[in-house]
Amino acid sequence: AHTKVLDTQGKYTWIKAPRYDGKPLQVGPLANIVVNYAKKNERVVKVVDQFLKDAGLPLEAVFSTLGRTACRMIEAKVVADNGLIALENLIANIKSGDTQTCAKYVIDNSKEYKGRYIGHVPRGALSHWCRIEKGVIKNWQAVVPSTWNATPKDKDGAMGAYESCL
């Protein structure tokens, strides 16, 4: 059997190198909270400002180990608060007679299907792409939060989030 050995002298990386508009991005709670704060999302601004006031810290403190940890908690609070709103909407739907919970469908194994998911999970941006042929998965691709944050330095010297924060 032919075995190919990794050429450690050449250029290689142990993780994908995604870019958005040619630039590396940071994803996750810190990025999510900072973007929402900058966009003046009222729910986020209220919780961030209260945290900073209670801790006696300036806004710049979110760009620290403490800030990263706080952003995880802040995001959890914002998500929980939004969950209460979703629960209230669900109860209102049920009371009005809307009890449908899913749309049933049948997969035709003679067809080809393509799908994708692009969304947000606790660690950050997540995307999946899938292609199914004759009931068999032919291709599955994922770009997970660590892929964005651990991306290596590129040819232009732009570092990923992990490298740049170290």
Per-region residue spans from a language model:
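Metal/cofactor-centered catalytic core regions of large enzymes
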Residues: 1-166
